[in-house]
Amino acid sequence: MPAERRRQVLVSLGLVAATFAAFGPVLRAGFVNWDDAANLLANWHYRGLGLAQFKWMATTSFGGCYQPLSWLSYDLNYLFWGLNPLAYHLTNLVLHAANAVLFYLVARALFRLGAGEADETRVSIAAAFAALFFAIHPLRVESVAWVTERRDVLSGAFYLGALLFYLRREIKASLACFFLALLAKASGLMLPAVFLILDVYPLRRLSINIREWLSQRCRPVLLEKIPFFILSAVFGVVALAGQRGAGALVPL
């Protein structure tokens, strides 16, 4: 195995171990007495793989959120383990550990692009520390320990995947990940704008002068964003409708 590949594997394993060490106690916890009872324990609509369950997942904004992919993940937990909280917490924890690895890969790609000819070892070390900070930061507790917030870690996984594929110029794969991220939770709506920022720096596909974006050279870069912005607009409308239907939007 090449040295660089071996380094990536070792860092990834270290991040997974650190994540489980930091959040492992959650595996002994029950459901959180916030929304878990209403969303999972008392909600029978998501349980099963029949047409009625899929229709409900695809059309509901239960609790104000449109999240069919998150509902499907709960359904799979229920089908294999019933309402055993261990399985639900373990799924959240595994997703967060995967996100830590994805964060490392994204950070490594960004540092490499920004640093130019910098030493690969330094790039990997910087990316590893950034990912470790993300993995064990206390702000991650809510998304990992609260089963209802599965949508955060699930959406985050595909969001980071979309970023990674975009940095590798794999636009179709990035679009697919973005779509899945929005199906888990609409919090990633602004990702197309992030892509534009990355196109300015460090990708340098667009000029910092916005007026130059209309040039022939920049046009393909902008056109490839159209499907992303269409998805953002559609899911943005759906998210607002769900929040309004749940009474979460109130006038100032």
Question: Where is each model-derived feature located?
Answer:
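Polytopic membrane enzymes that build or remodel cell-surface glycoconjugates and lipids
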Residues: 1-252
